[in-house]
Amino acid sequence: MNNVIDGKALANEILSELKHEVQRLKDKTGESPKLAIVLVGDNPASIIYVKNKIKHANKIGIDTLLLNLPITIKTEDLIAKISELNLDQNVSGIIVQLPLPNSIDKNKILSAISPSKDVDGFHPLNVGYLHSGIDNGFVPCTALGCLEVIKKHEPNLSGKNAIIVGRSNIVGKPLSALLLKENCSVTICHSKSQNLSSITSKADIVVAAIGSPLKLTSGYFKPDAIVIDVGINRIGGNKIVGDVDFENVKSKVKYITPVPGGIGPMTIAFLLKNTVQAFKIYS
């Protein structure tokens, strides 16, 4: 049995459904969803991510608008640009590509996006909805992608012991809320957690999202664990690896996602799913 989860194939299923839905919406309304992407500066990794998002959006019929702004832009000027996008009736969703330069107040920027267009799910109102168990807002795309992969391979999550290694607002915290809603027992670990392997080795599900290349070796997992690797780390020049020592772990566990080709494609699929949802709400 092949236990390596093909995130690209799962994402393509979602994108195929979305393509049909976008066409139906276009036939019905005469309009297409539109995703505005704000990119500040010229971080090479960010440019690659943005190009990827635009490519997949256009492939399924979602229009895109890229605002590439200078690294010198001030917080208040960036907020003004976002306010224009909030008012633009042709724009369904808005994302700001992270990370932002240190000179910009990230929290002010994310809070400036209209919650109804916040398809990344980072606005405080949407965060509040998620952690209150209210289904009104948008949920961060990587967390949604992780949950979808987990549920595809373990449909009944009730009572499962899930460990998330990483407490970011992008993955760790939102995914903990989603797994709690599925009645998992959830533990969040982080850089200050002690005896990490003794915690993770008891878990049914382990999500690694710490940004530390190949950190979690086979001793961190029990044999029937589901391992979701969210890490994207560049080593030795151009090689991309996850937070899990994939080659030595894959033969031990029940299921594992690779890097690349695991959660990355799912993140884009759910970003575009959120964008279509925003369009439907608005129209």
From Swiss-Prot:
Catalyzes the oxidation of 5,10-methylenetetrahydrofolate to 5,10-methenyltetrahydrofolate and then the hydrolysis of 5,10-methenyltetrahydrofolate to 10-formyltetrahydrofolate. Disulfide bonds: none annotated. GO terms for cellular component: cytosol. It comes from Rickettsia bellii (strain RML369-C). Pathway: One-carbon metabolism; tetrahydrofolate interconversion. HAMAP family: THF_DHG_CYH. Its EC number is 1.5.1.5, 3.5.4.9. It catalyses: (6R)-5,10-methylene-5,6,7,8-tetrahydrofolate + NADP(+) = (6R)-5,10-methenyltetrahydrofolate + NADPH; (6R)-5,10-methenyltetrahydrofolate + H2O = (6R)-10-formyltetrahydrofolate + H(+). This is Bifunctional protein FolD. Belongs to the tetrahydrofolate dehydrogenase/cyclohydrolase family.
